[in-house]
């Protein structure tokens, strides 16, 4: 007797609008921070043009270091002040978008539901907010530490303004790319978190792995899981490479999954 194929609901993927809005919010602060450091650097050069033989006398290294650190502290405080609001907006927007997409996917499969913010969902969102606050706060700390090294080396070596500014621009590009990676990675994780919580609430415990097909260096184990349409218990995760994981949970994982319906 042939086995009846069980119905599935289409996969829920991250909302690109939410991801881009999150990226833009971080980029706006990064742009302002980078411009601030470059403006300060130009002013410092105008006041004390570094020459190898007098650089340390014109602006002692301890004083220069203090000035860079003071500017860094101001930007650390600004990011700290903004981090919670940015993280909350991203998390709530992502939760709503994922709920809406999953609700429609279930409806299309003949399973109509209405979602509410349950205590379990609230706890999951609070954890997501905390993780993103930490990531946002790390941006100016890493940036200012790198900039201090660039500026200090430039002044003590007597390098011209353009060469140091070029190095700052390179660091700026790295920082913007990090913001893009954070927004993409966290959008994937948020989608996985919300989808898993909703499945558990509804008693929809089984899912089927889908490989994204994207990325320059895909994890071959994820490719195989998608090709095999590997099924897993969403309460535990899919056993891949010796650990139980959810699609989109690991860094740079863009995989998703279909919900297997119990009818």
Predicted regions and their residues:
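N-terminal leader/targeting and assembly helices and adjacent pre-domain segments
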Residues: 1-173, 261-263
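Acidic, glycine-rich two-metal-ion catalytic cores of nucleic acid-processing enzymes
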Residues: 170, 174, 178-263
């Amino acid at each position: 007797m042939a086995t009846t194929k069980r119905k599935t609901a289409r996969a829920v993927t991250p909302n690109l609008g939410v991801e881009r809005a999150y990226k833009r919010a971080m980029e706006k602060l990064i742009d302002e921070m980078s411009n601030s450091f470059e403006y300060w650097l130009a002013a410092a050069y105008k006041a004390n043009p570094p020459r190898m033989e007098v650089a340390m006398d014109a602006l002692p290294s301890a004083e220069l270091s203090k000035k860079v650190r003071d500017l860094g502290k101001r930007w650390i405080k600004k990011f700290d002040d903004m981090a919670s609001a940015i993280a909350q907006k991203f998390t709530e927007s992502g939760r709503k978008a994922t709920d809406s997409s999953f609700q429609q996917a279930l409806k299309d499969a003949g399973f109509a539901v209405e979602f509410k913010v349950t205590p379990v969902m609230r706890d999951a969102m609070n954890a997501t907010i905390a993780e993103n606050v930490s990531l946002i706060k790390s941006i100016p700390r890493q940036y200012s530490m790198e900039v201090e090294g660039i500026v200090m080396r430039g002044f003590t070596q007597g390098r011209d303004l353009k060469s140091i500014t070029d190095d700052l621009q390179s660091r700026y590009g790295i920082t913007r790319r990090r913001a893009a990676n954070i927004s993409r990675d966290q959008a994937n994780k948020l989608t996985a978190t919300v989808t898993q919580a909703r499945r558990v609430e509804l008693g929809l415990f089984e899912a089927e792995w889908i490989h994204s097909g994207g990325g320059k260096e895909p994890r071959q184990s994820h490719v195989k899981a998608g090709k095999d349409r590997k099924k897993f218990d969403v309460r535990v995760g899919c056993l891949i490479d010796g650990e139980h994981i959810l699609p989109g949970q690991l860094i740079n994982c863009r995989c998703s999954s279909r919900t297997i319906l119990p009818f």
